[in-house]
Regions:
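ATP phosphate-binding glycine-rich loop and adjacent ATP-lid/helix-beta elements
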Residues: 104-109
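N-terminal accessory segment detector
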Residues: 1-103, 114, 119-133, 137-162
């Protein structure tokens, strides 16, 4: 198995290559990642909803040693990444980070939320700082209201912003 610090650097180079091939190539890759991730999260969402998402990201928090806070209420899950280990590893590298590295998270999570009827608001805040806020809502009106507070709102394949 490839160590995570090598994996994220490899991912960064793959993203840069695909970006050089055009937006369609990059989005196709993100959609492939999304389909793969369905094996890990789709059943949790379909059977447990927001609680299943909370379970999934709690496991990721431990597995990837993330400095993140999770907050769950009846209509919303908020994931506040205080220090993203993935972007941190990419930035601690002699190769230039892909300018849109953070976009891959929305690129795989967004299509799953669309598929399951949830509404995602993904605020990267600043692509050069390893932090973000992901909010997932049951209610589309609450999601639209939350979008107004985002500093750098992300889109994903099938949902463009801006």
């Amino acid at each position: 198995m490839i160590p995570s610090d090598h994996f994220t650097r490899f991912y960064n180079e793959v993203f840069k290559f695909l970006e050089s091939q055009g937006e369609d190539a990059l989005e196709a890759y993100w959609l492939a990642i999304s389909r793969n991730q369905e094996r890990h999260i789709l059943e949790l969402i379909e059977t447990q909803g927001l609680e299943g998402m909370h379970e999934y990201w709690s496991h990721i928090r431990t597995e990837e040693n993330c400095d993140m806070d999770l907050d769950l209420d009846a209509d919303r899950l908020e994931l506040r990444m205080n220090l993203c280990p993935s972007l941190s590893k990419v930035m601690d590298n002699d190769a230039e980070p892909m300018g849109r590295y953070c976009d891959h998270c929305a690129g795989w999570i967004g299509p799953i939320m669309d598929k399951t009827g949830y509404h995602m608001v993904y605020d990267v805040i600043d692509r050069r700082k390893p932090q973000c806020v992901l909010r997932i809502f049951r209610d589309p009106d609450r999601a639209r209201a939350a979008e107004k507070d985002a500093q750098l709102l992300m889109g994903w394949p099938g949902r463009k912003v801006g």
